[in-house]
Amino acid sequence: MVITFLLLGIPHGALDVYIEGGLDHQNDHRKIFLRYVLTAALYICLWYWEPGIALLVFILITAFHFGEIDWIGNTNDQAKKVVYFFLGLCWILLLLSRHVETALGVFESITRNQINQERFLVWGKLFYPLSLITMLLLYGFLFYNKEKYFSWTQYWYIAAFQQVILLILAHTTPLWIFFAFYFGIWHSVLSLDKIRLHFKLSSSLQDWLFLLKKAMPFSAMAWIGILYFIFLTVKSTDPTGMLSLIFIGLAVLTIPHLQVFTKLNK
């Protein structure tokens, strides 16, 4: 899991400053970076004082972000954004409810035991079939509206095939392995490809390495911050606690990342 985060997960977010400021040095990256840090700092404060609310915010913004990255349809109006937000939300709820006991341990650690265990387990059993059925209904809706939602109708079949692969993996792997695959590989590669297209770079190895090289300074800073946060607050022998703090670290970086990255889909 750490390897996928290190090689792809963090670097795709580390390019945010270049999305706003450009790959060259004509724009002041320091101002962009300062705004990024201040936004993250405000969210850290929310995690400290209201971890339950911060967790809810994280789930909602992650649903939107995962949905927009996986989405291969049109993005020319709000209706499309609503569809891929709910697809992303269904994915998160399905994944958490499928692995409800593991998720409970992580959420208890994140929220400092503010989670009602019995209620969480009951809701988890409810959300699993609900999220799966909603996802199937959404794809059924998209099937009958392929011309409206996709620039090429065959994209629906590609999107459906991708979802089948992810569903199989979600049902056959532990939560942390699927999370490592989805965030560290699937989501990150798709995100990096969108960034590559944004900067009109080719798909050559040279241009891919160029992107990763650009990401290295801010990747190092992000990893130092996350690791420092982890080692200050949890013992290395506590895997649930470690995973919880990784989630918080990623959550803190997600809000400013979403603010920047959504511009690619406008």
Annotate each language-model stretch with its function:
Residues 79-148:
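Long hydrophobic alpha-helical segments that form multi-pass transmembrane helix bundles
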Residues 182-199:
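Predominantly late transmembrane helices and immediately cytosolic-facing juxtamembrane segments
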Residues 228-248:
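Extracellular/periplasmic helix-loop-helix junctions in multi-pass membrane proteins
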Residues 13-22, 63-76, 137-151, 195-196, ...:
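C-terminal ends of transmembrane helices
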Residues 1, 45-55, 170-179:
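Transmembrane helix interruption/hinge and helix-loop junction motifs
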Residues 25-34, 56, 77-89, 152-160:
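Cytoplasmic-side transmembrane-helix entry/capping segments in multi-pass membrane proteins
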Residues 35-45, 66-68, 159-169:
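Hydrophobic, membrane-inserted alpha-helices
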Residues 20-27, 73-87, 198-210, 262-266:
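A cytosolic-side transmembrane-helix exit/cap motif
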